[in-house]
């Protein structure tokens, strides 16, 4: 394989630029040419494809977002869009593609593979909800950003004796809420993976104020449960009498310079994706499991609720993607007593 392309798709995540940089520089070191695709699958179909060299990725490792831009392009789910994209790739002499993004991006990569065009996926999303990897690019940065914000909210919460509901991104996964909640010493964490009793949440707030000597209360809420405003309304209906405020951290979690960890894992996975394409391997997604690189079938990782990893013998192992999350939920309960 002499010429490959790289794209970012779906929601942006800190560390994507580090992954692009690794793909470009690793490929060049292997004697391959690299092309960038602007705006994900939309740019692929439109032919927004151009050469990338070491100079173009210089000084990008510390930048958040993605300099290749990103876009959601539902038309690629249709056969017409897929064939149009492949036609553009062949027109530019491209033989394989590295796709950086979330599960929607992986579905696109899976379609390319089904049409016989080699594609390798790299998990890039702050949500950390991609099967086949313990961590996704951008997750660590998002958690650190959330912790910094919650620490500041605690300052004002304690100054005024208030309860704060802090809503964080994560789509249908509670990873950001759990990690940020534990790291910031949240009093309660509400995530989609665990059922909750709103009356118990309200009574816990009251008990903390009346019997534990606390003058403030922090609840970290994953957006996959409900909005912060809706949760606050339910709290009031359940009898909460505290001075309640809601803060939605929103898209701020997607921005900022990536952490050292995100830069390292992005570089590691980007380099390995090139190695796979050089070997002519497509239809795989790169991930990290137990601090080691792993490869998973894109077909498995793109299916919600499945978690696949490969042994050295090539056997597929199915694991439980929510075990660590539930362990963390139990951990926070024990620490917030």
UniProtKB/Swiss-Prot annotation:
- Entry function: Catalyzes the phosphorylation of D-fructose 6-phosphate to fructose 1,6-bisphosphate by ATP, the first committing step of glycolysis.
Query: Could you tell me what this protein is called?
Result: ATP-dependent 6-phosphofructokinase
Q: Which organism is it from?
A: Streptococcus pyogenes serotype M3 (strain ATCC BAA-595 / MGAS315)
Enzyme class, one word? transferase
Q: Does the keyword Signal apply?
A: no
Give the matching NCBIfam families: PFKA_ATP (TIGR02482), PRK03202.1 (NF002872)
* EC number of the protein: 2.7.1.11
**Activity regulation statement:** Allosterically activated by ADP and other diphosphonucleosides, and allosterically inhibited by phosphoenolpyruvate.
Subcellular location per the Swiss-Prot or TrEMBL entry? Cytoplasm
Which gene is annotated as encoding this protein in its UniProt record?
pfkA
Q: Give the residues the record marks as binding Mg(2+).
A: 103
- Annotated ATP binding sites: 11, 72-73, 102-105
Main location as per UniProt: cytoplasm
- Enumerate the residues binding ADP: 21-25, 154, 185-187, 212, 214-216
| Cofactor(s) named in the record | Mg(2+)
Mind listing the UniProt keywords for this protein, alphabetically? Allosteric enzyme, ATP-binding, Cytoplasm, Glycolysis, Kinase, Magnesium, Metal-binding, Nucleotide-binding, Transferase
Q: How does it assemble?
A: Homotetramer.
Q: What protein family does this chain belong to?
A: Belongs to the phosphofructokinase type A (PFKA) family. ATP-dependent PFK group I subfamily. Prokaryotic clade 'B1' sub-subfamily.
User: Which GO terms are recorded in the biological process aspect for this UniProt protein?
Assistant: canonical glycolysis; fructose 1,6-bisphosphate metabolic process; fructose 6-phosphate metabolic process
Q: Which residues form the active site?
A: 127
PROSITE patterns found in the cross-reference section: PHOSPHOFRUCTOKINASE (PS00433)
Write out the catalysed reaction: beta-D-fructose 6-phosphate + ATP = beta-D-fructose 1,6-bisphosphate + ADP + H(+)
